[in-house]
């Protein structure tokens, strides 16, 4: 048998970077940003485009068309954009790249509800395409309030700007929230599908722009050691946490109509559940992956009204101390009613009714002004049999735990038991940890780079389909109904800077089941 050949240090990284598929540029196109002068565009989208340009993924030629009601011209918008890039880019942007992006940016002023705005946009798109030798490939990013989603799509259709013809494509990117309940989500889907085919609609979830989330597919299906034990025989339970230290800040008006459940669970958290629990797809084709995700969402058991009372917890933060600073209660935030019953914390215990996950609880938790900022997936395995250790000082065997951290630092850690050095048998817990930044280096990212790139190449894998959106809302409909029918009597019920209401921790019964974040 020949000797094993070790790869030279750094060889894996170099092969990943140089692989042709990774260097595929997006299709030449014009990105139309409705709400192009707003915060999302300034802080996330434009910096993400700068990063794509520096990494060599932005198509050439490429142009931006911003559409807003602000009293600006193309020249004044370009000046503002230059300053915004300097302010919000995650690192200094190469001057030549910044200049090229700014020079290929154009501006249309108009009301989103005015048909003349779309005629003006149509004319400008034609001019820019001719001037810059661009095909008529357009993707429209709706960085606007949800009330404009249907209106803008209807107007695009009426102006002939949504129709795909002569080999050119049209795509529409829609931000969350996609509806505020099952009824409104269905209505919005029906409205936009009168204009667009499903393959043209990209319902974006920026959580899926995180490398660790995308790595779930590689981690599960690209390694022979994990998938065989990824089922009810070996896993005790799964905890998915999205904890934020920030409060609602200046978004009190929006949050009053949303709350933590609507804001985070049917989109962000259910996407993480579906990627964690899905069956292997037949390929990495977008619909093959999303078919399996949709099966998980449809298999999630909706809670009965009685189960809502025992398997959900809601909370609202009171005044408290965070990072050594006093912070106000939710009811004292701007644009929040002083008697508000809106929840800023939500926790649920759910089950997936299929062969792989039958009887395994999934604990979901999200909240504002919690003790630590962390988004993670924690898989706790079943404990080993204790018989062998009955005559030793070991009192219990701690369960193995796999923790996939999405933010703030992207990492994967596996904890397992090891003997503590010494003459007697004692168990300690040790960790094997992989940190993305340590191995691959730390590249600046807004979380939108991969998603924008996928829009340009037409890969919808990381975007939700209509059936996925509606399935997510279906699961929480009973929770919304019960919570609305029974206003909370104990709000506020957790201090800012803590881990939320104590009832959330009490949902984790049984030996070894503890709140993952509190234990970390």
Model-derived segments and spans:
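Secretory/organelle targeting and membrane-embedding segments
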Residues: 2-174, 178-520
């Amino acid at each position: 048998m020949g000797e094993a050949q070790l790869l030279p240090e750094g060889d894996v990284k170099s092969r990943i970077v140089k692989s042709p598929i990774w260097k595929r540029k997006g299709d030449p196109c014009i990105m139309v940003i409705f709400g192009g002068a707003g915060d999302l565009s300034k802080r996330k989208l434009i910096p993400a485009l700068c990063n794509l340009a520096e990494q060599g993924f932005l198509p050439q030629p490429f142009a931006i068309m911003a559409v807003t009601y602000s009293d600006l011209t193309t020249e004044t918008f370009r000046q503002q954009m230059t300053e915004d890039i300097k302010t919000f880019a995650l690192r200094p942007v190469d001057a030549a790249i910044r200049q090229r992006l700014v020079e290929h940016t154009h501006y249309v002023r108009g009301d989103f509800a005015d048909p003349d705005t779309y005629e003006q946009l149509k004319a400008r798109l034609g001019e820019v395409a001719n001037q810059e030798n661009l095909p008529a490939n357009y993707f429209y990013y709706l960085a606007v309030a949800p009330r404009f989603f249907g209106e803008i799509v209807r107007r695009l259709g009426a102006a002939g700007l949504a129709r795909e013809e002569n080999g050119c494509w049209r795509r529409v990117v829609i931000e969350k929230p996609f509806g505020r309940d099952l009824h409104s989500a269905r209505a919005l889907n029906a409205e936009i599908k009168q204009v667009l085919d499903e393959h043209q609609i990209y319902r974006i979830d920026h959580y899926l722009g995180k490398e660790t989330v995308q790595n779930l597919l590689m981690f599960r299906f690209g390694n022979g050691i994990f998938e065989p034990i990824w089922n009810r025989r070996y896993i005790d339970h799964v905890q998915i946490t999205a904890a934020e230290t920030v409060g609602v800040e200046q978004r009190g008006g929006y949050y009053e109509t949303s709350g933590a459940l609507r804001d985070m669970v049917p989109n962000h958290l259910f996407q993480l559940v579906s990627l964690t629990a899905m069956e292997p797809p037949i390929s990495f084709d977008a619909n093959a992956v999303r078919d399996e995700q949709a099966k998980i969402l449809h298999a999630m058991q909706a809670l009965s009204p009685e189960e809502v009372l025992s398997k959900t917890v809601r909370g609202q933060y009171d005044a408290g101390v965070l990072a050594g600073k006093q912070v106000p209660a939710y009811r004292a935030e701007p644009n929040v009613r002083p008697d508000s019953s809106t929840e800023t914390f939500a926790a649920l215990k759910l089950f997936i009714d299929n062969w792989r996950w039958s009887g395994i609880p999934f604990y979901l938790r999200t909240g504002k002004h919690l003790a630590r900022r962390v988004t993670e997936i924690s898989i706790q395995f079943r404990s080993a049999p204790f018989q062998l250790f009955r005559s030793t000082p070991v009192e219990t065997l701690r369960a193995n735990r796999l923790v996939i951290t999405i933010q703030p630092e992207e990492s994967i850690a596996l904890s397992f038991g090891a003997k503590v050095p010494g003459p007697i048998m004692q168990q300690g817990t040790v960790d094997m940890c992989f940190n993305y930044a340590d191995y691959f280096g730390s590249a600046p990212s807004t979380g939108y780079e991969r998603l924008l790139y996928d829009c340009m190449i037409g890969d919808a894998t990381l975007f939700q389909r209509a059936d996925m959106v509606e399935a997510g809302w279906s699961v929480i409909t009973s929770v919304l109904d019960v919570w609305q029918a029974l206003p909370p009597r104990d709000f506020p019920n957790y201090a800012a800077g803590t881990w939320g209401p104590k009832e959330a921790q009490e949902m984790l019964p049984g030996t070894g089941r503890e709140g993952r974040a509190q234990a970390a």
